Amino acid sequence: LKGRLETLKVHSKDVLMDETVDLDALALATAGLVGSDLANMINEAAINAVKKGRKYVNQADLFEAFELVAVGGKEKKDRVMSDKERKIVSYHEVGHAIVTALQTHSAPVQKITIVPRTMGALGYTLQTPEEEKFLQTKDELLAKITTYMAGRAAEVLVFSSATSGAANDIENATAIARAMVTQY
């Protein structure tokens, strides 16, 4: 956390930022990102501010840049889903969020969206940890698996079938389960 905060400070020293900017919160949310990702985030935030006609970067610019770097591309608002697909994606993402909220070992949900991204995601549920952790307990790992599978479960519960939208969730849940068996 301290290293990410220092990296963010180094890359933002020449960038004008307003009073809403909280680099501590950004450092906490960016666990797993490397220095070049953090530098890209600061640069993208500055570009966002300039595009919007502002001299100062604000927290919203930084969060938008975080999503671009960490989540997978820019919003692709011109990708038009059918009403049925939008409904499926909505239930899928809400499934993740509800299960996250009901578990005691999950990071809280910060954002849910069904706006497609340029990297392929039709929506996502963003969780941000409340504190930096270097180890995860079995209960925390099982909570992650449960959360990943909750989107698919919501699809089956509401629509009586699952879609290909859960493919990445299944990959992530499987990777955690495999690591639990073979590495921990």
Where are the language model's segments positioned?
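Conserved P-loop NTPase/AAA+ ATPase motor core
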Residues: 36-184
